[in-house]
């Protein structure tokens, strides 16, 4: 255990008010590619860049191509929670962790047993008919052909926030509240490149800001503790 991890353990042991803010790097150890990493979706062969394909305009204009990309790249049905997801669920059960705020859409925090998860960008596990509102699970989307259709004939839209779409205000508001009231705030596996989610960190008022990331963050966060490494690998030591 490194000195940094020992310091983190001391912080965790001494509090019952942790808030965890995570991004794609939390799920890479479950085999889900990081959208922006060098070997992630950005650098894989496709006609248009992922940000274009995953935009509201593209979804409306080219639904067939949108769903082809969506099924191929964003639906990771076989993925299982890793050490990071499991440790966070354990902390929640112990009453130490108050909330997980995630930029991920894979539902792995809930699969690990976490109850209070704020999904800033929605979830691939929820899908709704745009016409009648009927719910469909991820398996239906995965195994449907072309543009998925409801029994009523309406198009089914994944409950994920696309580029050009706004984040759910209620979820954002709750995230701000948890961050403001946190004793220890852990930011992990995120480049903090996407707004408004990335802007949430500025609401933290405490002095126990921990950053766990494989690569150093560009932003001057004034972190009190920085650990360079994989999130699951790090949390598994605690």
Q: Could you describe each region identified by the protein language model?
A:
Residues 1-238:
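Conserved catalytic core of sirtuin-type NAD+-dependent deacylases
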């Amino acid at each position: 255990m490194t000195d940094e991890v020992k310091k983190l353990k001391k912080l965790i042991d001494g509090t019952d008010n942790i808030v965890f803010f995570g991004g794609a790097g939390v799920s890479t150890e479950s085999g889900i590619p990081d959208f922006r990493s060098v070997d992630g979706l950005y650098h894989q062969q496709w006609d248009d860049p992922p940000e274009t394909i995953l935009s509201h305009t593209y979804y409306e204009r080219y639904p067939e191509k949108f769903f082809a990309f969506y099924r191929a790249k964003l639906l990771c049905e076989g993925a299982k929670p890793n050490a990071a997801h499991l440790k966070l669920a354990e902390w929640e059960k112990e009453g130490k962790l108050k909330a997980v705020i995630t930029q991920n859409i894979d539902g792995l925090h809930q699969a690990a047993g976490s109850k209070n998860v704020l999904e800033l960008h929605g979830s691939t596990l929820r899908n709704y008919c745009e016409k009648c509102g009927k719910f469909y699970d991820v398996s239906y989307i995965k195994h449907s052909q072309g543009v998925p259709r409801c029994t009523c004939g309406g198009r089914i839209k994944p409950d994920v926030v696309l580029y050009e779409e706004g984040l759910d205000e209620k979820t954002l508001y709750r995230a701000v509240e948890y961050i403001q009231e946190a004793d220890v705030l852990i930011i992990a596996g995120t480049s903090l490149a996407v707004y408004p989610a990335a802007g949430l960190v500025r609401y933290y008022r405490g002095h126990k800001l921990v950053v766990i990331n494989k690569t150093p963050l560009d932003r001057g966060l004034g972190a009190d503790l920085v650990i360079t490494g994989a999130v699951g690998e790090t949390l598994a030591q605690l």
